Amino acid sequence: PRLLILDEPSRGRGPRCLQKLADLLLRLNRDIGLTVLLAEQHLPFIRRVADRFCVLHRGRNVAEGDIMALDEPLLAQWMTPDPAP
């Protein structure tokens, strides 16, 4: 299987670049069966390119499922900053 791993590919990119990147990833998946694994925080981009998600918190899988189930309230419970020591 072909696999592409990307770490925050949306970071620092403008809307036009994000659209082109999303189109490219979707085309590669469709045309050659490329699987893409994203480490990403930009929710609109994730929704555009993914069909499944997994939320990791401190190295543990805390939520996963169909991309349609991924929403702000679900993420908010895991994205709060840790208290200062």
Regions found by a protein language model. Name each.
Residues 4-7:
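Catalytic Walker B motif of ABC-type/P-loop ATPase nucleotide-binding domains
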Residues 10-11:
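Short loop immediately C-terminal to the Walker-B catalytic DE motif
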Residues 15-17:
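Helix N-cap at the start of a conserved alpha-helix in ABC-type nucleotide-binding domains
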Residues 19-31:
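Helical segment within the ABC ATPase nucleotide-binding domain
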Residues 40-41:
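H-loop/switch region of ABC-family ATPase nucleotide-binding domains
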Residues 46-48:
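A short, surface-exposed alpha-helical micro-motif characterized by mixed small hydrophobic
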Residues 52, 64:
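Short, glycine/charged-rich "phosphate-handling" switch motifs in NTP-dependent
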